[in-house]
Amino acid sequence: MVLANKLDRNLRAAEESSDGEDYYEVTDRSSSASVIEADEGGNVISSDDDMSDASDHDDDKIKAQMSKVSFGALAKAQDALSSKQSVDRKRKRGDDTSKSQEDKLEALRERLRQIKAEKLANGTQPSKKAKKSKTKTKTTQDDNVEEKEDSDSDAAPHARSSKHAPAVQSSKRMVSRKRNVVEVKKPVFRDPRFDNVSGPRPEDYVVEKRYSFLKDYRASEIAELRNTIKKTKNEGEKEQLKKKLLSMESQQKARENKERLQDVTREHKKKEKELVKEGKKPFFLKKSEQKKIALVDRFQNMKAKQRDKVIERRRKKVTAKERKNMPDERRTA
C-alpha cells in the first residue's frame, strides 16, 4: 500500500482583483509530519520514498490540470502582466523626471528673481539676453502665468520699455475720498466795474481816459528807476534794475503802438460813417492796412535823428533775419 491512499492536496485557481491575472496556486492541506506504514510482510517503508512518489503524483496532476487551460486565458494573463509592468515603469520614470524638471524650473525662477531685484536696485532695465533666456525657460502654460505674475509684482510702476521711450503716465485717475453730502455753491468774486451785469463794457480808449493817471504814475516810476541805477554801485543789483527798466519801457512802447492803432481805426470809422450817410458802402480796413497807416503816422511825428535810428535798427533786424534763413554754404562764404 502507498504511504497514503489520499493526500489531501488540491489545486486552487485564484484570480487577483488588481491586475485581472489568472494564476494557479498549489496548497498543501496535509500535515507536515511523515507517516510510517508497514507492508504485508511487516517491512517498514521509508518516508523518503513515499514523499518522492507523492511529489511525482502531484506533478502529474498539475500537468494534467494545466493541459486543460486554454491558450486564450494564458495570453490574457501574459498581456495583463506585461501591461502592469510597463505602467509601473512609466510611473517610476515619470515621477523621477517631473521632480527633476520642477526642481530645475524652481531654481531658474529663483535666479531670475534675484537678477531682477539686483537690476531694479541698480536702476537699470533688463537686457535683451535676459529676455531671451526668460522665453527659453517658459516650457508650459502654467509656467508662463507664474512668470508673468512674478514680473508684474517685481517691475516698477509705469516702467519704460527702453531709456529712449517716452515716459508713460496712466490715464486712470484716483477717485477722491471726499464726498459732498450737501452741494454748496462756490463763491465767485467779481468786480462790478468790469461785469456785464452792470451794463455793456466800455471801449478801451474810454477806459484809458478814465485811468489816464496811471500813465503819469508809470512815467514817474521809470524816472525813479533810472536814478537808482545811476546811484547803485553793486553790479548785480544794477543788472537786475536794468532788466526791470527794459521790460517797463517795452511795455510802454507796446501800449503806445496799441493806442496808435486804436486812433487809426477810430479815425477810419468816423470817415466811413460820414460816407455811409452820403449813401456809399462801408469799407473795413484789414489788420495789415491798419499797421501800415500807424507806421506812417509814427514816422511823421518823429524827428530826423530818431527816424534815422529806427530805420537803421530795422535794417539790421531784417538783414539778421535773412542771414538766419540763408544756407550754411552761402553764409560762411
UniProtKB/Swiss-Prot annotation:
Q: Where is this region: Disordered?
A: 1-179, 249-275, 304-333
Q: Where is the composition biased (Acidic residues)?
A: 16-25, 143-153
Q: Where in the cell is it found?
A: Nucleus, Nucleolus
Q: Does the keyword Repeat apply?
A: no
Coiled coil spans: 92-122, 219-281
Q: Which GO terms describe its cellular component?
A: 90S preribosome; nucleolus
Q: Mainly localized where?
A: nucleus
Which terms are listed as keywords in the entry? Coiled coil, Nucleus, Ribonucleoprotein, Ribosome biogenesis, rRNA processing
Q: Where is the composition biased (Basic residues)?
A: 128-137
Show the ranges annotated as biased composition (Basic and acidic residues): 1-15, 54-63, 93-119, 252-275, 319-333
Quaternary structure? Associates with 90S and pre-40S pre-ribosomal particles.
What is its biological role?
Component of the 90S pre-ribosome involved in the maturation of rRNAs. Required for early cleavages of the pre-RNAs in the 40S ribosomal subunit maturation pathway.
Q: What is this protein called?
A: rRNA biogenesis protein RRP36
- Say which species the protein is native to: Pyrenophora tritici-repentis (strain Pt-1C-BFP) (Wheat tan spot fungus)
Which gene name does the record give? RRP36
